[in-house]
A protein has these predicted regions:
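Generic hydrophobic alpha-helical scaffold/packing signal
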Residues: 3, 35, 49, 166, ...
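Conserved helicase motor core of P-loop NTPases
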Residues: 5-11, 19-186, 192-195, 333-338
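Short glycine- and Lys/Arg-enriched binding-loop motifs that mark or flank ligand-binding interfaces
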Residues: 13, 24, 199, 250
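Hydrophobic/aromatic beta-strand patches that form the interior of the parallel beta-sheet core
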Residues: 14, 44-49, 152, 261, ...
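Short alpha-helix capping/helix-loop boundary micro-motifs
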Residues: 170-177, 190, 243-249, 271
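Residue-level recognition of short, solvent-exposed, well-ordered loop/turn junctions
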Residues: 179-184, 198, 252, 258
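C-terminal accessory regions
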Residues: 201-338
């Protein structure tokens, strides 16, 4: 629909993206097709090689390139060589192969509880001294902590899934006596142009202003703080919203985090273990730069090495007919010019 609205004689269109990431849900692989360096649009393609998210010469850069090319040995060696690196020197890369006991593995629960400890400390301090804090300052601090960590799952439901992680997080919040939905990260699941909130946007639920003035928590007064726009939107007005302590790898595209946990499929033959899925997940990691000092991001992969290897040697094969249609369109244009 977008291209139908464009005046081709007066408009130049630039498409920017990563052809090696997961394609959108649905048939075909639009961006991979149009950006194929051997395809019919090759003369119109510029291949960008410098990464601004992480250092290509460090461990993460090497594992990203190797996963893109399906180089199993380089990826597996990287996990062994960089398991205990100082984050000021290089990217820590860790592989946790223990099987889930119930919905989640013991190693993941330990990792997650450690990462959740910082937001919980901020929440505890807020609950003790809420009248001394401003709503926006508190929301900004919580968002900063939540959005520095990405828990990215291959599966939406089942063992080692986004749903399992969100349920585990909720059990921790209940144990801490934190009323729902206060202080939880939430993801919007449907566009709402009236509220100007859109599918995939994540915010943090904050109590209403009265809570910061000493009143009891009132869920009807809760707001969702969206850090990208620094806006507060009433929680009850957003019809389709759900917890986002963990999201799927598909949902994470376009996002970046200083620490990333990847929950791989349990079954190597499920069809989810693909090269594009693994590459998309590992390239969500970002380094943090403060002047001349760089703190390198970390990657923890939870799953069997056999599943990682299966993913690396399984590129997605999708046929949508777009290449054929582009070739036909070019042929028609050339005949018209003659």
């Amino acid at each position: 629909n977008l291209f139908k609205c464009i005046d081709a004689d007066r408009t130049k269109v630039i498409l920017l993206g990563d052809r090696f990431q997961l394609a959108a849900v649905g048939p075909g692989s639009f961006f991979a097709d149009v950006s194929d360096l051997k395809g019919p649009l090759a003369d119109n393609i510029s291949h960008l090689t410098k990464s601004w998210r992480f250092d290509a010469s460090k461990a993460l850069g090497k594992i990203a390139e190797a996963s893109r090319e399906g180089e199993e040995l380089i990826v597996t060696d990287a996990f062994v060589e960089n398991s205990d690196n100082d984050p000021r020197v290089d990217n820590p890369l860790r592989l946790h192969e223990d099987a889930p006991k119930g919905d989640l593995s013991a190693s993941f629960k330990k990792w997650f509880e450690n990462e959740l400890s910082s937001p919980l400390k901020v929440i505890a301090e807020l609950r003790r001294n809420r009248t001394e804090k401003s709503l926006h300052d508190a929301a900004h601090e919580l968002a900063r902590l939540y959005f520095s960590v990405g828990v990215l799952a291959s599966n939406r439901e089942g063992p080692m899934s986004a749903q399992a992680v969100n349920a585990f997080a909720e059990s921790i919040f209940v144990k801490e006596g934190i009323p729902y939905p206060a202080f939880r990260p939430m993801i919007v699941r449907r566009n709402d142009s009236m509220l100007e909130v859109y599918n995939g946007v994540i915010g943090v639920v904050m109590p209403g202003q009265s809570w910061f003035e000493g009143a009891e928590f009132d869920a009807t007064q809760a707001n969702v703080y969206f850090p990208d726009s620094a806006r507060l939107v009433r929680f009850g007005l957003i019809g389709h919203i759900e917890p986002a302590f963990a999201i799927t790898i598909h949902q994470s595209q376009g996002s970046e985090y200083h620490h990333v946990a990847v929950l791989m499929p349990q079954d190597p033959n499920s069809g989810l273990a693909t090269r594009e899925l693994f590459y998309t997940a590992v390239t969500r990691v970002r380094d943090e730069r403060n002047g001349k000092q760089t703190t390198y991001g970390s990657l923890d992969v939870f799953g069997k090495l056999t599943v990682v290897k299966k993913a690396l040697r399984t590129p997605v094969q999708r046929q949508g007919g777009l290449i054929r249609r582009i070739v036909e369109a070019k042929d028609r244009m050339q005949k018209t010019r003659r």
